[in-house]
Amino acid sequence: MSDSQPAAATFEPIPTDLLAQMHGLRAALGELIASLFPGAVLTGTGADFPLLQQMVDSQTLAATDEPAWEAMGIALGDALVTEVPGLAWVQVSDEFGVDPVLRYRQTSLQIGVLTLLLKRAEQGEEIDIQHIANWLQKFIETKADEYQ
């Protein structure tokens, strides 16, 4: 067994190919929402929280539909970026791999929003979008100074 510490996370701008994948997932979710809820449009703001909750409540997405839940996570992340000053999309490289995350300012505080909803769906947990958004905002407000 090694006493070495895991490598520190490194943050970089999201590469173009990953941005394109994320855009594709956003577009697919937007089309699904438009087909289920005529006139509804994702705005990338906190106004999306109730719409995302409608998607959850509609039970349209299978718990195993990873791309759809990742798209939901992206939409949640987009809204959080507009609601929480200092949050931004970045790519993180750490002991768990390379993923797009939300990072708070220039700290180590990161939110793996792409899989946040997916994991809850897979585990059959209740998903309350507004509660999750409020909790994350409060966590950042009260705990961000603990992250360097």
Model-derived features: where do they sit?
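N-terminal low-complexity, intrinsically disordered segments
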Residues: S2-E66
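Short, well-ordered coil loops that connect the C-terminus of an alpha-helix to the N-terminus
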Residues: G39, G86-L87, H131
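Short coil/turn segments at secondary-structure boundaries
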Residues: G44-A47, S93, I132
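Short runs of predominantly hydrophobic/aromatic residues within well-ordered alpha helices
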Residues: T45-D48, A68-G77, Q110, L114
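Amphipathic, interaction-prone secondary-structure segments
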Residues: Q59-R105
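A recognition module on extended beta-rich or small alphabeta surfaces enriched in W/G with H and D/E
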Residues: V101-Q148
